[in-house]
């Protein structure tokens, strides 16, 4: 039996036409529980220190991946984050998007360390990052506020060093 062809994944700069689909994906319960509720408009365009890319799968907007670069040259590290349309979860697309961005940050931008900090209770995201080569460094206790709540949740600090990419 033939295996279905793997979907074509691309990372590209955000475009104004991405707004509606990214907001729809971002508001999905599986996404918004880990990300702040978006305000009106296109909330990802007003943070100049972050670089955001649209994740496309088979030519369609499928999510967002972003990175923040440490501005001090002696550190040369970046942190990343992403969300993906829940309808595409479980297909390896998040892992592939992370791998591609990591390669770009190491090969093209000269970073030697990439970090990510998922919620400690977001087991699916942690698995994605581990498949991409990230290792757990430690738990950051009471790291971020619960979305829509008064409590705190722990975060997991994960890192990948140049040469460790999978």
Task: Write out the residue ranges for each language-model feature.
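Conserved GNAT acetyl-CoA-binding A-motif
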Residues: 107-117
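Conserved active-site alpha-helix within GNAT-family acetyltransferase domains
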Residues: 95, 120-138
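Acetyl-CoA-dependent GNAT
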Residues: 13, 29-89, 95, 104, ...
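Conserved catalytic-core motifs of GNAT/GCN5-like acyltransferases
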Residues: 115-118, 135-151
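Conserved N-terminal entry element of GNAT/NAT acetyltransferase domains
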Residues: 1-20, 156, 160-166
């Amino acid at each position: 039996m033939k295996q279905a062809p793997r979907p074509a994944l691309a990372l590209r700069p955000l475009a104004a036409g991405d707004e509606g689909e990214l907001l729809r994906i971002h508001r999905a319960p599986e996404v918004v529980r880990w990300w702040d509720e978006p305000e009106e408009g296109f909330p990802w365009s007003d943070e100049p220190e972050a670089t955001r890319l649209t994740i496309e799968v088979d030519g369609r907007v499928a999510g967002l991946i972003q990175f923040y670069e440490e501005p001090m040259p002696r550190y040369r590290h970046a942190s990343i984050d992403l969300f993906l349309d829940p309808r595409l979860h479980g297909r390896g697309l998040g892992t592939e998007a992370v791998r591609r961005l990591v390669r770009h940050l190491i090969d093209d931008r000269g970073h030697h360390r990439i970090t990510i900090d998922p919620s400690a209770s977001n087991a699916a995201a942690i698995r994605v990052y581990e498949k991409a080569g990230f290792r757990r460094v430690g738990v950051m206790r009471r790291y971020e506020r619960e979305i829509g709540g008064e409590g705190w949740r722990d975060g997991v600090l994960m890192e990948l060093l140049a040469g460790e990419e999978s």
